Amino acid sequence: MNRFSTGAIAVLSLLLAAELPVGRALSQERAQERSDIDRVKAASQVFIAAIAARDIGAMDKVWAHESYATFIGPLSTTIVIGWDGVKKAWEMRFGQFDRVTISLAESHVRTNGRVAWAVGVERVELLRKDGKTLSFDAFVTNVFEERGGRWLMVSHQATPIFRAAD
């Protein structure tokens, strides 16, 4: 009557028991990834706030001070490589504008180990020193590295979105 042998039942029991820790580990991994994504989003918000405040001190805290850090802003004419150059680029940009308004209209974050990337769309409004306003949307990619529980930026690229004229 019994369709399963005692040996088959024992093997099936072992397989099911083995899946419980694996399932638990996957659940913990997903929870960690969710936590990392939330922390990357928070780091992105700190970055945006530093830009809006034109605060180089705040910018200094969100970036990794590495020779491989990179910056390409929406008004850039060159790629800036290395933290010292990145910091100077931000100082220059902060000096060009009396006000910066920036918000994330869309954001997608992914983590993989100690590296994360956030891509999305920024809405930007700049008040120049001459009183003229420059408004645009930009595709943005930010890359972060996890260091001691903190996610620090190692690359920022923002590219203006060109819209076809009607």
Predicted regions and their residues:
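A short hydrophobic beta-strand element
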Residues: 114-124
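Short, low-complexity N-terminal intrinsically disordered segments enriched in polar/charged residues
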Residues: 20-62, 165-166
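Bacterial N-terminal signal peptides
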Residues: 8-21
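A short, structured loop/turn motif at beta-sheet edges
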Residues: 109-116, 129-132, 144-150
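A solvent-exposed, acidic/Ser-Thr-rich amphipathic alpha-helical stretch
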Residues: 35-38, 56-111, 121, 135
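Positively charged n-region of N-terminal signal peptides that target proteins for export
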Residues: 1-6
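Short beta-strand edge/turn micro-motifs at domain boundaries
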Residues: 23, 117, 137-164
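A short acidic/glycine-rich loop-to-helix N-cap element
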Residues: 129-135, 163-166
